[in-house]
Regions:
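Conserved acidic residues
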Residues: 57, 96, 175
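A short, flexible N-terminal coil/short beta segment enriched in small residues
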Residues: 1-14, 56, 67, 77
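Pre-active-site segment of Zn-dependent metallo-hydrolases
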Residues: 17-58
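Metallo-beta-lactamase
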Residues: 2, 10, 16-18, 34-36, 72-75, 79-121, 128-129, 155-171, ...
Length: 200
């Protein structure tokens, strides 16, 4: 696992040769139990590292296409699962908790829904006002730029952009943008989001 911009955040990844990007997962280490976000399957080394940090208490999935290795990790570590409430009726993994817009499942973490993405109520997560975590809707296929999912995969592109603008209005101090697919932005992330949200 790799360290990120905060001492309590780490990531592990898997390279996708077709898209030429990494798929990313996150660990948020907490005294009250670690939280995994959109977890890929663990390599033996990553599992050993995670267990050395206390394992996983919770797994938070931003959308049904980012279930990834959640089921096997939950079974192996006894972690409880959190999913987007808008997908509750058809979510592929049983969840112990459902969250939606404005919820705070853990102190310091605020949930926002991305409307118009490819799945209903996709979650974006804002951590302590300065870091935002996106699952599918916002991504980066090259460094220092952000993009949306291809329009053919979005339900309503303008709704996605409006959701991003709303997040920026509510959290003007965002500086770091972490994505499930592609390059993360560790500086000037708010500016990159503003550029994306202003795109036609």
């Amino acid at each position: 696992m790799k360290r990120l911009h905060r001492p309590d955040l780490l990531t592990w990844s898997a390279y996708d040769p077709a898209l030429m990007i990494d798929f990313n997962s996150l660990v948020w280490t907490r005294p009250d139990g670690n939280v995994l976000i959109d977890p890929l399957s663990l390599t033996a080394d990553d599992e050993k590292h995670l267990r050395s940090m206390g394992g996983a208490a919770w797994i938070l999935m931003t959308n049904s296409d980012h279930v990834r290795g959640a089921r096997e990790i939950a079974a192996g570590m006894g972690a409880r699962a959190i999913g987007p409430i808008a997908e509750r009726d058809a979510f592929p993994v049983p969840c112990d908790r459902w969250v939606g817009d404005g919820d705070q499942p853990f102190p310091g973490l605020v949930v926002h829904e991305i409307r118009g993405s490819k799945t209903p109520g996709e979650l974006a997560l804002v951590l302590e006002e300065t870091t935002v975590i996106f699952g599918d809707a916002v991504r980066a296929h090259r460094a220092d730029t952000l993009m949306l999912l291809p329009e053919a995969k979005l339900r309503v592109r303008n709704d996605v952009l409006q959701s991003i603008r709303r997040i920026r209005t509510l959290h003007p101090r965002i500086e770091h943008v972490l994505v499930g697919d592609g390059w993360c932005s560790f500086r000037h992330g708010g500016t990159l989001l503003d550029e994306l949200a202003g795109s036609a």
